[in-house]
Amino acid sequence: MFTSVPPIATLSSRRIIPENLQGRVLMKLVYVVLEPQYQSAMSAAVKSINKNNSNLAIEVSGYLIEELRSPENYEVFKEDIAKADIFIASLIFIDDLATKIAQAVAPHRDRLSACVVFPSMPEVMRLNKMGSFSMENLGQSKSAIAQFMRKRKEKSGSSFQDSMLKVVQTLPKILKYMPMDRAQDARNFMLSFQYWLGGSTENIENFLLMLAQNYLPTVKEKAKENGSGLLQIKDPVTYLDMGLWHPLAPKMFESTAEYLAWFNTRIDIPDDMKDPLAPCVGLLMARTHLVTGDDAHYVAMVQELESLGARVISVFNGGLDFSKAVEEYFYDPKQKDRAIVDSVVSLTGFALVGGPAKQDHPKAIEALEKLNRPYMVALPLVFQTTEEWQDSDLGLHPVQVALQVALPELDGGLDPIVLSGRDSATGRSHALSDRVETIANRAIKWANLRRKPRHEKKLAITIFSFPPDKGNIGTAAYLDVFSSIHKVAEALRDNGYDITDLPKTSHDMMTEILHDPEAMVGSPELNIAYKMSVSEYEANTPYVEDIIEQWGAAPGHLNSDGQNLLIYGKQYGNLFVGVQPTFGYEGDPMRLLFSKSASPHHGFVAYYTYLNHIWGADAVLHFGTHGSMEFMPGKQVGMSGDCYPDSLIGALPNIYYYAVNNPSEGTIAKRRGYATIISYITPAPENAGLSRNLQELSELIASYKDLRLGGRGVQITNTIMDKVRLVNLDKDVELPEQDAKDMSLEERDNVIGQVYNKLMEIESRVLPCGLHVVGEPPKVEDVTDVLTSIASFDRPEDNMKSLLRIMCDSIGRDIEQLYKSSDKGIYADVELLANIRAIANKAVGALVKAKADDDGRVSKLSVLNFFRMGKTEPWIEVFQDNGYPNVNKDDIKPLFEFLEFCLKQIVADNELGGLIKALEGDYILPSPGGDPIRNPLVLPTGKNMHALDPNSIPTSAAVQAAKTVVDRLLERQRQDNNGVYPETIAVVLWGTDNIKTYGESLAQVLCMIGVKPMPDALGR
């Protein structure tokens, strides 16, 4: 999967041994860092000292944190630590590696002359020691200073780091005049921060000299003999912590006004680029790359954007909170509430606030929502070299996917495209020119969506004809595609887009595109929108030779008339509705996913060539879950220019309607199709119901209630058992061999109870019913089913009981015991549970009906028009009238307030609004995907759906739900096995299910083996 890391001993650039000491003191140094840019600065500083300093020589061994996963490298690291004088570490936030580092260094801490650790996990920070200064008791100190710092952190939250930077900058000036050793050691620790954050070769060189002068015993002894300092040390060279930068500028700038004033004096660019109306792209950069001189990839990005005619405003920040830079520099200096950038690209590769440490996504979202611009996150390779990435079928290292792809997605980040690689020997970054070009082109395309008038924008809607079952064209999971497209087209027309000749109905539109509503995939009856000659196709498809190698010469036999490539679809003014071709391997669809030689066919490629280069779309809308473009061969994440999804989509902004309950495959569209997801709600769940034979059985059981005590009780019991055998339900319910006349009333009740319970289980299975239409308000019964399902879950994280539990409590029963007795087939309890469920649905229905309009639908307007006017809530009346008058109102009130909140989220029509915002080049709010029943926070739909926070699963709710499931499973297994618990249990783990349930399956496994997940020191 990934190229193995070479042994550290072979990496000569980071293992530097001075050739000749010539009487100099030797200091042995070991460092571990996250950021490879420090590798080149450290190596240059050590080489400079070894060459120029007559009193000190340094032997250094350097490590990038991910290299310590290799057992061989870790053993070499421990050997180096055992011989070291000084240990330095920075940004060690990967929990398992932080533990390994702490375990390796801690036994040698007292012997080491100094340990200097910059922001990292607490167990690594505790290694800090410089003379009398120590962090050994970090987090445990009761000193006034420690308590002050804790309170400061709690109060300021994510801005704590910025406060700390101010302390680092000012405290050394104060401590300088305090004579005590402890004060001087504390001052040296603060100075170390300044040297390190300065990052230049000069600063790192003086940092190492300062450590040797003050903490290396042999240097200190020689200094005493000389009566003065042995080494000449300069104070840290300080740089702006936050500001603006340009590779051609003479300096860094503190304000946007100052930067623009310089920008407008340039003679190397045309006057058009100085015009405030020119497309403007904002770049976010890490200051460490600038001060260490490791900025080749930043220079390349600025140059590429400017070559495309864009103004570039590139800003940097020294901390981990880039929201301040966004708010400070991306607005007009003369009009502070007006953003001057049209799109933003982060080149840091990390979350906007918090970087690789603890993120603050709400703060990031607040800043980005205010800016309201598309936000792309490009990826510098941090955890792997260029060669490792190029050779990997997976693409990005899993840790890099988590930190640099998954976490920025929670901020609303788009287009995770690799920006730069790094040299395995020097650690220096280098731009990947074709990737830089792709990022720049996409940034400008997003910017142009903001700038172009609506009536001039050309849009493409792509519908699917998805094999292998050759289903009807225009299908998508849970979505009425043509009705939804018609609604979207009407909304676009009403908002000023040039949509002409739109059919009156969705059926008419479908007929125009298909000609025959029953047309199957590959049917010649599809409407031909364009015939593309082979010469035109080849001229506009740079990678056509790769397709010819697999499929032969164009045009091929798919989507072709033998001479031309055929583009199916229909044009409505500036809207093109096109049919995505099949992927070509209908007989063996898995070949496309697993064969390295597979590729899209000429017809498939021609469709996207048409959208990009001939139709000239400003954006494409993939309509529904899901198409096949994002599943084309290539790396899984962090694609190269040779990966087909990257080549197919090109620079087109890709907006994708996706079912909210499928974030796992939606994530594939985001990462491989560069999609901005607009989620749509799935149809309301309905009970599966019973087949005709099972319904007849249910009616017999209903009759049993009235006949059980009379003479016909035996007869109807026998009839029910015969019916159970007839419908093959006896395979699920164990029936006695004897006649009912030989059974007691209790035994008959138990048999009928077990059958009744099995029927309830079958009938109450929840299935989505119908198809969703984008922009159409839901029906009362649909909303009732959704809210009833939501109300059926305990939510301990919100201190909220389920509705069934509240109703059980009101009659003195425990819901868990009721489930158990119902599972055992105790007839009275099976009947009670059925009644509770029915009344719960009726109570929730009363809430929904009170907020419905005259058409039996629930809209934003009808919800707002509901007033109680001091009346008893209708759901309370349902409880009072149906045998549950004693429900605890303190429990019911928060639950129904929550259900009202969920109702508002369900009817919030943001699916059309979200699409129109995306087409305007606005920022689309991120939102988790998943099951709306388990997690109503995925609502309202119409947001940029992401998967999950890898640092947050399993959630506490998932752990609680998992425990309930495991307890019930084990109890049922015990009952079915004569009181014996199972010895082994097999569990199938699906990524999709874990994303939907926020890690419930993982939590089940943990529960079964008897462990409970605990957060790390950062709460992850």
Regions found by a protein language model. Name each.
Residues 2-77, 82-1020:
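Ligand/cofactor-recognition surfaces for anionic moieties
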